[in-house]
UniProtKB/Swiss-Prot annotation:
It catalyses: Endonucleolytic cleavage to 5'-phosphomonoester. CDD domains: DSRM_RNAse_III_family, RIBOc. It comes from Acinetobacter baumannii (strain ATCC 17978 / DSM 105126 / CIP 53.77 / LMG 1025 / NCDC KC755 / 5377). This is Ribonuclease 3. The gene is rnc. Belongs to the ribonuclease III family. One of its GO terms (molecular function) is metal ion binding. GO terms for biological process: mRNA processing; rRNA processing; tRNA processing. Residues 161-230 form the DRBM domain. PANTHER family: DICER-RELATED, ENDORIBONUCLEASE DICER. Digests double-stranded RNA. Involved in the processing of primary rRNA transcript to yield the immediate precursors to the large and small rRNAs (23S and 16S). Processes some mRNAs, and tRNAs when they are encoded in the rRNA operon. Processes pre-crRNA and tracrRNA of type II CRISPR loci if present in the organism. The keyword Ion transport does not apply. Mg(2+) binds at residues 46, 119, 122.
Amino acid sequence: MTKHQFKLSDPRLLSRIGYQFKQPELLQLALTHRSVSHKYNYERLEFLGDSLLGMIIANYLYHAYPHENEGRLTRMRATLVRQEALGKIATDLQLSRCLILSTGELKSGGHHRESILADTVEAIIGAIYLDSSDLNLLKDIVLKWYTPYLDHIEPTDQLKDPKSRLQEYLQARKKPLPVYEVVDIQGDAPHQHFKVECLVDGLSKIHGEGSSRRFAEQAAAAEILKLLEQ
């Protein structure tokens, strides 16, 4: 039995996901990073899963918060589907030990990279849908993953993204706005990894990383907010 076959047949993994695949090759595809194969990888499943996740979360929020306006519902959805939230879901599902990566990607810490983990969660969502053809079943599975986070989310301004919150924090105190600068880009488009430096008056430079400049800037802003709010 190969390592990948063991992962796919591991009842603990399937139990954490909450679904038994009829076509286990779909799960294997959902766990396979582009570094292993340019053709056989999770990217198409991720594309499908991203749309399905957005719809499932939007539908949940629409019914759970009947009196909230479109703006707040949009911010709540963004909070629940962003990379950071998906990274937490991946940690709950213990996906890092199950990723199928190239040796180089593994050595560089790819199995702990939040962007890869988030992409994998979306790919698994796409795989479950293709395997089951059952949107209601998929909805139940995804919302079960999200239960710890749905129980605590509130339609408040704190649901704004870190860059918006940091800007408002500084504006309220009449301080200069943050300056963001890309200091490193690895890989080729559209599969690049960005490192951004954020400078806020009175603080040391803080770095953030992500699969896009926007994600990297958000990560840096989140770290600065942690320092400012201590």
